Amino acid sequence: MTSSERVAKVVLVDIEGTTTSISFVHEVLFPYAKQNVEKFLRDSWKVDDIQRIVQDMQQLPQFEEYKVLLRAPPAEVDVELIAGFVRYLIDQDLKVTPMKTLQGLIWEQGYTNGELKGHVYEDVPAAFEAWRAAGLQIAVYSSGSVAAQKLIFGHSLVGNLQPHLSAYFDTHVGHKQDQKSYENIANLLKEDPKQILFLTDIPGEAAAARSAGLQAVILQRPGNAALADDQKASFELMPDFKSLQNLKLPINKYQA
């Protein structure tokens, strides 16, 4: 199928490696969270929402693993223990929901005070505008929390892109390489899966989406992981969003 022939009702975009550079996430966002997590927890330790996150983090199997690594783990859970655990999870690149939620709150402070601006590739705003003008919905599915997703697009280098976006999904709907997650998204969007185009940089995610009936395209942005030959042969590949700007809604057979 050529880009000019492709139709969809919804474009579902990944963030890291798709709309936003991997380097921004790993060289800006993650270090910012690591540097600021302890101060953030000290300032908000007694807040009910933060305590709920702390409780959820203690239920993670990695929490006991982390305490084993400590020479002298504290008798009680305190700021230093949880801050260290968060830094450990970030270093291990473990995408667990309570940690992602906490990261989102830390980043919110950074975006609000102007220390952070969300990176998007230069072709993203024009594609968003074209898709919305054509009547398509744009939704986001990322391992980062919904709050963090809104911050990247709401405080981007080119301004607020949130008006283009109609739905956000994170790991609460399931893991990104699980077919069921994409079925859940289609159900929540109330759309036929084949009318949803998923854009990602990860073959495993594209395969899961395709198994659920979605269309899937893999983005080969600068800095993205190289693909094996069999992966290149199995999926449609694109360098950016430019060739997708002509996406159209399917023609209603009663209007044709």
UniProtKB/Swiss-Prot annotation:
The keyword Metal-binding applies. Coiled coil: none annotated. Substrate binds at S142, S143, K176. Keywords: Amino-acid biosynthesis, Cytoplasm, Hydrolase, Magnesium, Metal-binding, Methionine biosynthesis, Nucleus. Its EC number is 3.1.3.77. One of its GO terms (molecular function) is acireductone synthase activity. Its cofactor is Mg(2+). One of its GO terms (cellular component) is cytoplasm. GO terms for biological process: L-methionine salvage from methylthioadenosine. SUPFAM superfamilies: HAD-like. It catalyses: 5-methylsulfanyl-2,3-dioxopentyl phosphate + H2O = 1,2-dihydroxy-5-(methylsulfanyl)pent-1-en-3-one + phosphate. InterPro entries: Enolase-ppase_E1, ENOPH1_eukaryotes, HAD-like_sf, HAD-SF_hydro_IA, HAD_sf. Binds 1 Mg(2+) ion per subunit. Pathway: Amino-acid biosynthesis; L-methionine biosynthesis via salvage pathway; L-methionine from S-methyl-5-thio-alpha-D-ribose 1-phosphate: step 3/6; Amino-acid biosynthesis; L-methionine biosynthesis via salvage pathway; L-methionine from S-methyl-5-thio-alpha-D-ribose 1-phosphate: step 4/6. Belongs to the HAD-like hydrolase superfamily. MasA/MtnC family. This is Enolase-phosphatase E1. It comes from Drosophila yakuba.
